[in-house]
Amino acid sequence: SIMKMDGSQQEENLEVISTGSLGLDLALGVGGLPRGRIVEIFGPESSGKTTLCLEAVAQCQKDGGVCAFIDAEHAFDPVYARKLGVKVEELYLSQPDTGEQALEICDTLVRSGGVDMVVVDSVAALVPKAEIEGDMGDSHVGLHARLMSQALRKLTGHIKKTNTLVVFINQIRMKIGVMFGSPETTTGGNALKFYSSVRLDIRRTGQIKKGEEVIGNETRVKVIKNKVAPPFRQAEFDILYGEGVSWEGELIDIGVKNDIINKSGAWYSYNGAK
């Protein structure tokens, strides 16, 4: 279809889904993850990738949205999801056998127009059918990348039409023999890097301790790519075990940064109240 941008096509504001972290919503520049787009969240193991996605799912459900979770890693924990505020009984969960099946399910969900957000956890676990049916040790060079490339070509148009947010979680691998620059790369070839409107790099920067006991992680998220606002901003927040993103701690940090809350030593005060 061809159209003229003369105002007859109403320019609407970009719809977003909150990440559950105020600082990250601000860093994204539009107040959350953009709908009708592909988002990639990647980082090392235990950095909070799935937690961040489940926080966003909880926010989407709070606004009356319908969410689907494609669990290719077969590691979804409903008890933990419920603690983060996810209405597990309203969540569509799929645990596919092959990468092709997972992406086919994703495409069907998107085309139906009945879901607002789809999470694929994770790209690394989308194993091509030929690899599953083959023997251990067989070489399947480029198969995973080809699968992703083909699926994203199909998906991207449907995602825009139905205004669905699709989030791909990805893992990090090391490139061998890299002398200069970062040796880190994400799995599944280059297609996802191109098709993503937002790419988030999530890292664990430290531990939160209560006495000797570790009760959470300090987390930093960098916006590596952003097609809907200026990129390269970052957010820092705490993820507490069994609770998710520490909303109160983040609110205080942002308040201090913007001189709304005064900090003196270990005390915080707002309008004279400590």
From Swiss-Prot:
Coiled-coil ranges per UniProt: none
Record-given protein name: Protein RecA
Function of the protein: Can catalyze the hydrolysis of ATP in the presence of single-stranded DNA, the ATP-dependent uptake of single-stranded DNA by duplex DNA, and the ATP-dependent hybridization of homologous single-stranded DNAs. It interacts with LexA causing its activation and leading to its autocatalytic cleavage.
Gene that this sequence comes from: recA
Keywords: ATP-binding, Cytoplasm, DNA damage, DNA recombination, DNA repair, DNA-binding, Nucleotide-binding, SOS response
Cytoplasm is among the record's keywords: yes
One Gene Ontology term of the molecular function aspect: single-stranded DNA binding
Residues annotated to bind ATP: G43, P44, E45, S46, S47, G48, K49, T50
InterPro entries, sorted: AAA+_ATPase, DNA_recomb/repair_RecA, DNA_recomb/repair_RecA_CS, P-loop_NTPase, RecA-like_C, RecA-like_N, RecA_ATP-bd, RecA_C_sf
